[in-house]
């Protein structure tokens, strides 16, 4: 059984015991998009396996940027009925859904942690974090002053994403750029970072991931909900082209993300985590846990 003692939360919560100060457990609100809602399948189960009571709530709009979040906040100021977000919540294993806006969500509970992130297609642009990210931080501090604001570092795409060609660089350079942008934003505002983009990069390096013309090579990004043999197809020129998602996490990636978040937010021994979905091998889970644990000690590489 894992234990909850410190980590990011201990700094603000004073080493809350596993029983928590609230019957709902540690309350985490994610103001995000498709790069955060993917935590809903596995993070509650990992937390339960660790004996950590968790109330996890996701605000989701696909591809939602920091600028759009703030546009929504301003729209809500003139229209209280404006509820553009899908809300998914898992409180001690009980799941609910609804519609909500950012301001109402921030006041819904006394959140212990509120997480934010940039939309992935802007994440490599440091200028995209300002002023909208700063404004969102100010709104969170206004409506949820007790909450610890934590930034999730998102990940770089696989080589098949056409946007990389448009931008003029590959996955590694995208990572270096977003890594620097998130680091600068977090430092400016005094936030902790969940280094999942770095975790994905470490996975690619240490597995190692070897892309081929018709394979993701073991990556945790790409090929979601598709069998390996269905991820690529021949085009009219008989060249292999992707036949699936090439930038979201696949199912294994979602489990990996849950482990990295668990290690970042709580003082847990991931080696003791018994929960593992059947599509993750023992060796894969071992490497995921090793990377997550190492990044907890040295999160910014």
Task: Locate each region found by the language model.
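Conserved SGNH/GDSL esterase-like catalytic core that processes O-acyl groups on lipids
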Residues: 37-133, 139
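Bacterial Sec-dependent signal peptides at the C-terminal "C-region" and cleavage site
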Residues: 10-24
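Residues that mark the start of a beta-strand
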Residues: 25-27, 55
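Short hydrophobic segments within beta-strands
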Residues: 29-31, 152
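Short, hydrophobic/amphipathic alpha-helical patches that form generic packing surfaces
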Residues: 252-267
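C-terminal accessory extensions appended to soluble enzyme cores
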Residues: 265-301
């Amino acid at each position: 059984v894992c234990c909850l003692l410190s980590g990011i939360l201990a700094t603000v919560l004073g080493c809350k015991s596993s029983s928590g100060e609230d019957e709902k457990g540690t309350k985490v609100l994610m103001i995000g998009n498709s790069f955060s809602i993917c935590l809903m399948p596995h993070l509650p189960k990992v937390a339960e396996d660790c004996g950590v009571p968790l109330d996890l709530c996701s605000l989701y709009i696909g591809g939602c940027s920091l600028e759009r979040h703030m546009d929504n906040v301003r729209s809500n100021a003139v229209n209280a009925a404006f509820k553009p977000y899908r809300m998914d919540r898992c409180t001690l294993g009980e799941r609910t859904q609804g519609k909500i806006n950012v301001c109402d969500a921030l006041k819904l509970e006394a959140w212990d942690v509120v997480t934010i992130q940039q939309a992935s297609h802007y994440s490599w642009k440091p200028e995209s974090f300002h002023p909208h990210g700063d404004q969102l931080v100010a709104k969170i501090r206004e409506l949820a002053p007790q909450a610890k604001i934590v930034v999730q570092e998102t990940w770089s795409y696989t080589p098949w994403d056409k946007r990389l060609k448009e931008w003029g660089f590959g996955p590694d350079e995208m990572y270096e750029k977003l890594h620097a942008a998130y680091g600068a934003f977090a430092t400016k505002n005094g936030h902790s970072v969940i280094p999942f983009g770095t975790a994905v990069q470490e996975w690619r390096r240490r597995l190692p991931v070897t892309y081929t013309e018709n394979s993701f090579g073991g990556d945790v990004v790409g090929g979601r909900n598709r069998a390996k043999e269905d991820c690529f197809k021949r085009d009219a020129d008989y060249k292999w082209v992707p036949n699936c998602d090439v930038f979201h996490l696949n199912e294994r990636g979602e489990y990996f993300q849950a482990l990295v978040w668990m290690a970042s937010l709580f003082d847990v021994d991931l080696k003791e985590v018994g929960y593992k979905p059947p599509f993750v091998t023992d060796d894969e889970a071992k490497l995921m846990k090793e990377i997550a644990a190492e990044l907890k000690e040295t999160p910014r590489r």
